[in-house]
Amino acid sequence: MPRVKRGVTARARHKKVMKAAKGYYGARSRVYRVAVQAVTKAGQYAYRDRRQKKRQFRQLWIARINAAARQNGLSYSRLINGLKKASIEIDRKILSDIAVHDKLAFTALVEKAKAALV
């Protein structure tokens, strides 16, 4: 079996890691051994946070809807229940966007929800 010289593959692997670690602080962007750890950890955080991002945005939408609903004299849960009873199918993302950018339309939705609750 012939000898395998690994210079080319090792250099390529090092370059890939160092490119990914570009912009990191101190040794994390300069020392391969430390950069490998930093890049691996960054990947773990990215994987975790891609899932958390979905939860956090939903929380934000609900907080915005709740605030706008309370300004119109209704709690979030009663608003959602009223919209369901009025068979208005609108998701929380769009509902929060309406609450922030179009107060009149949101007020109209709240009134329909209130009417459906009675």
From Swiss-Prot:
This is Large ribosomal subunit protein bL20. GO terms for molecular function: rRNA binding; structural constituent of ribosome. The gene is rplT. The keyword Cytoplasm does not apply. Binds directly to 23S ribosomal RNA and is necessary for the in vitro assembly process of the 50S ribosomal subunit. It is not involved in the protein synthesizing functions of that subunit. One of its GO terms (cellular component) is ribosome. Belongs to the bacterial ribosomal protein bL20 family. GO terms for biological process: ribosomal large subunit assembly; translation. It comes from Aeromonas hydrophila subsp. hydrophila (strain ATCC 7966 / DSM 30187 / BCRC 13018 / CCUG 14551 / JCM 1027 / KCTC 2358 / NCIMB 9240 / NCTC 8049). It comes from the Bacteria. Keywords: Ribonucleoprotein, Ribosomal protein, RNA-binding, rRNA-binding. InterPro entries: Ribosomal_bL20, RIBOSOMAL_L20_CS, Ribosomal_protein_bL20_C.
